[in-house]
Amino acid sequence: MAQWNQLQQLDTRYLEQLHQLYSDSFPMELRQFLAPWIESQDWAYAASKESHATLVFHNLLGEIDQQYSRFLQESNVLYQHNLRRIKQFLQSRYLEKPMEIARIVARCLWEESRLLQTAATAAQQGGQANHPTAAVVTEKQQMLEQHLQDVRKRVQDLEQKMKVVENLQDDFDFNYKTLKSQGDMQDLNGNNQSVTRQKMQQLEQMLTALDQMRRSIVSELAGLLSAMEYVQKTLTDEELADWKRRQQIACIGGPPNICLDRLENWITSLAESQLQTRQQIKKLEELQQKVSYKGDPIVQHRPMLEERIVELFRNLMKSAFVVERQPCMPMHPDRPLVIKTGVQFTTKVRLLVKFPELNYQLKIKVCIDKDSGDVAALRGSRKFNILGTNTKVMNMEESNNGSLSAEFKHLTLREQRCGNGGRANCDASLIVTEELHLITFETEVYHQGLKIDLETHSLPVVVISNICQMPNAWASILWYNMLTNNPKNVNFFTKPPIGTWDQVAEVLSWQFSSTTKRGLSIEQLTTLAEKLLGPGVNYSGCQITWAKFCKENMAGKGFSFWVWLDNIIDLVKKYILALWNEGYIMGFISKERERAILSTKPPGTFLLRFSESSKEGGVTFTWVEKDISGKTQIQSVEPYTKQQLNNMSFAEIIMGYKIMDATNILVSPLVYLYPDIPKEEAFGKYCRPESQEHPEADPGSAAPYLKTKFICVTPTTCSNTIDLPMSPRTLDSLMQFGNNGEGAEPSAGGQFESLTFDMELTSECATSPM
């Protein structure tokens, strides 16, 4: 079954997570219309190869045209309009950046597969009593459901008792007025009043019963309000707080378990019960106005009950107003909460009380740093204005599940310029990527005679003015959301708390697993721990400061740990994503460990790892070989950076890499990817077929062109070889080989970085006849 069809059969909670994946950057409608074709493409490869991305993008536009023709034949005007709009949007945004749409689609498809896997795992664990985590969560939710059901039942029982009391009071009122009228007549006629006294006794008995019923109802109302208070505290202080924490985790790459539908159903159910109870309390006031007496419990307790139910409902409504989707720039969906001035960002708010009567009634206003006292307390903090459509009315039509929400799609920030270049005080206490700002959403609710002011705010955001500030800004977002669940601590970085390696390791792994199909292994994390903390046996519980993580240079390096790692993450996403997803890149491994695992392998075995010395992010390969004396040697090529990988894919570099041996013959030192995968099996599918690489020769030309192929060659000196006699033919060949590369800019990749001895080596990227 196609992946998209499987997704349609999931429960509502999973479908809500599916909705979170899609936005204007890649509309869900397009995913629906072209599901089979989209799933048949290799988007991961397209995301790492611009030429292939361009081809796939143009094929995508062609598929849209074909689907449009089908809708045209079906006279489906709405779908025609939507598809035309989608195509125009894709052309305007991705025509010059086809790799961007490829990355977005690849990420969505991978998240879909993760969602299916999560649903399947949950289904398998549903009936297993030996899964403690699943059992605790299920039991907790069942208890909450039972409490809500109990509240609803008690409200309905009270409704019936209110009717009984009302009927009893009507009977008492009628008999009392009748007796009073008869008593007046008897007084006028002077008749015996024995009958009247008998009826008075009956009225007293009715009043006693009425008083008992009233006291019972007042007592039950007080107990019901206490039960509501308990359920509300569980919902807001536990369930909603847990959701907000999960949202924080999801923002920094953690599991996207942030569905709100179930929580919305619970809160809506409680709100409905509270409003019904408030009407019952109002009914008590009506009964009191008709019949009242000395010691009336309604007179004594109704005002307090009214005050309690109104306070509960107000607090529930205030808690139910949440930011469903945190501020995020569409071009950087994997890095929310970082906003660049002048660049549009989106956000979405939602009211978890699903009352149809509130549809199109709540006007939301957006502002930034409303409570500017905390922000202003930081010397030199910048100030911003929100531009664009900063007001919107909440409605149920825009959301896929009918929730009451408002999505802001066209917001931008502009810095308020001051005389010293925009900063309020040049003596700033924090750098700009450590400044935290809050985006606030406000509205007013008028419902059943109540006016309630609602306000919620985003998680703290970092505002940058240049995209080069993104790495440090994202580090701030990671550190904040990793270490605190305080949603408003804009002073966090005046004294940033210390994290533990266990916390940092989990977040670092998320940076890979959230944008690729693979997180970090224990061995890879251990290597990173060694870079941060130095050699050690057990890093669990070791403390890491904010400065060590992001600001201080690593030992012997001119850059920080985070700058180095972030550039590697960028390198993986843009250039070697497919190879990383396959698990072919060992990545983070110490040179000692590298030597240990390769030294026992046959010559030609190689592994792929990230450079430890390249600030911009580099990837290299290390292989084992035998020198002429039979001694095992471990060799590494100088790391390939983004600049080289822009011109040739890493898979093609590996497949074509050559060295010139002692006999001046080009040979490939790379045979088996560690541990024993043939090179062709691992990387062949990621190289273009020769038929695509070399177009047909012009049939009208005098002679066909000779086909050429770019390969990376490392010519060696004789420092580690015995001088061999060289024939004139070999010398001529080498001279010609050197002249072919004359004038060309030498590639940074292709040079040895010897792990055993120093070698004087050069690098050339040459063309050789096919």
UniProtKB/Swiss-Prot annotation:
Q: Cite the effect that the entry attributes to residue 415 to Q.
A: In ADMIO1; likely pathogenic
Q: Which residues carry this modification: Phosphotyrosine?
A: 640, 705
Effect annotated for changing residue 389 to A: In ADMIO1; uncertain significance
**Mutating residue 658 to R: effect?**
In ADMIO1; uncertain significance
> Residue ranges of the SH2 domain?
580-670
Effect seen on changing residue 389 to I:
In HIES1; likely pathogenic; loss of transcriptional activity
**Record's keyword annotation contains Transmembrane:** no
Q: Which disease is it linked to?
A: Hyper-IgE syndrome 1, autosomal dominant, with recurrent infections: A rare disorder of immunity and connective tissue characterized by immunodeficiency, chronic eosinophilia, distinctive coarse facial appearance, abnormal dentition, hyperextensibility of the joints, and bone fractures.
Something else known: Involved in the gp130-mediated signaling pathway.
Q: How does it assemble?
A: Forms a homodimer or a heterodimer with a related family member (at least STAT1). Component of a promoter-binding complex composed of STAT3, NFATC3 and NFATC4; complex formation is enhanced by calcineurin. Interacts with IL31RA, NCOA1, PELP1, SIPAR, SOCS7, STATIP1 and TMF1. Interacts with IL23R in presence of IL23. Interacts (via SH2 domain) with NLK. Interacts with ARL2BP; the interaction is enhanced by LIF and JAK1 expression. Interacts with KPNA4 and KPNA5; KPNA4 may be the primary mediator of nuclear import. (Microbial infection) Interacts with HCV core protein.
Protein name, per record: Signal transducer and activator of transcription 3
Give the originating organism.
Homo sapiens (Human)
